[in-house]
UniProtKB/Swiss-Prot annotation:
This is Replication restart protein PriB. Involved in the restart of stalled replication forks, which reloads the replicative helicase on sites other than the origin of replication; the PriA-PriB pathway is the major replication restart pathway. During primosome assembly it facilitates complex formation between PriA and DnaT on DNA; stabilizes PriA on DNA. Stimulates the DNA unwinding activity of PriA helicase. GO terms for biological process: DNA replication, synthesis of primer. It comes from Serratia proteamaculans (strain 568). Belongs to the PriB family. One of its GO terms (molecular function) is single-stranded DNA binding. The keyword DNA-binding applies. Homodimer. Interacts with PriA and DnaT. Component of the replication restart primosome. Primosome assembly occurs via a 'hand-off' mechanism. PriA binds to replication forks, subsequently PriB then DnaT bind; DnaT then displaces ssDNA to generate the helicase loading substrate. The keyword Mitochondrion does not apply. Keywords: DNA replication, DNA-binding, Primosome. GO terms for cellular component: primosome complex. InterPro entries: NA-bd_OB-fold, Primosome_PriB/ssb, Prisomal_replication_PriB. It comes from the Bacteria.
Amino acid sequence: MTANRLTLSGTVCKTPTRKVSPSGIPHCQFVLEHRSVQVEAGFTRQAWCRMPVIISGKAHQAITQSITVGTPLTVSGFISSHQGRNGLNKMVLHAEQIELIDSGD
């Protein structure tokens, strides 16, 4: 088996969409914005990305109901390519684990 794991923390930056497939599987899709400072070759650099995320299954329904724009999260799962309506491929993080980050309020 080939490794395909990604853990990314960030803030939800687009309103989540929730749908149920014809087979009854709930899906929640949103975009996670990540910003951090990383060290590469001994130098610091700004790291930034926006990653589309999809989380599926009834086991995750409760946590996805609390996700809104601005919610800080850590998401773990695998990445896969999805083809959009415009014919372009984009990387999507298929979440298998999701954690709300306590903002300390």
